[in-house]
């Protein structure tokens, strides 16, 4: 029989979802000549922040 080991949930990976605006959303980003831009019209459902709805497109 193999020895038992203890696994700590806080080590390595922590499950959960972070707000998009905390990780990738950069409102003051300035475009470069090499950027490719696309436009999407997004209408968030009631209670959903606009940047979170936009993250669904990204």
UniProtKB/Swiss-Prot annotation:
EC number: 4.1.1.39
GO cellular component terms, semicolon-separated: chloroplast
Subcellular localization(s) per the UniProt record: Plastid, Chloroplast
Catalysed reactions, as listed in the record: 2 (2R)-3-phosphoglycerate + 2 H(+) = D-ribulose 1,5-bisphosphate + CO2 + H2O; D-ribulose 1,5-bisphosphate + O2 = 2-phosphoglycolate + (2R)-3-phosphoglycerate + 2 H(+)
Recorded GO MF terms: monooxygenase activity; ribulose-bisphosphate carboxylase activity
Positions annotated as propeptide: 1-2
Any one of the GO BP annotations: reductive pentose-phosphate cycle
Residue positions where N-acetylproline is found in the record: 3
PANTHER family linked to this entry: RIBULOSE BISPHOSPHATE CARBOXYLASE, RIBULOSE BISPHOSPHATE CARBOXYLASE LARGE CHAIN
Function noted in UniProt: RuBisCO catalyzes two reactions: the carboxylation of D-ribulose 1,5-bisphosphate, the primary event in carbon dioxide fixation, as well as the oxidative fragmentation of the pentose substrate in the photorespiration process. Both reactions occur simultaneously and in competition at the same active site.
Subunit structure comment from the entry: Heterohexadecamer of 8 large chains and 8 small chains.
Family: Belongs to the RuBisCO large chain family. Type I subfamily.
Protein name: Ribulose bisphosphate carboxylase large chain
Organism: Weinmannia silvicola
Gene from which the chain derives: rbcL
């Amino acid at each position: 029989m193999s020895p038992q080991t203890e696994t700590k949930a806080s080590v390595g990976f922590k499950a959960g979802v972070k707000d998009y605006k905390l990780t990738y959303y950069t409102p003051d980003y300035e475009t470069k000549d090499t950027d490719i831009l696309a436009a999407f019209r997004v209408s968030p459902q009631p209670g959903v922040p606009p940047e979170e709805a936009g993250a669904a497109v990204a």
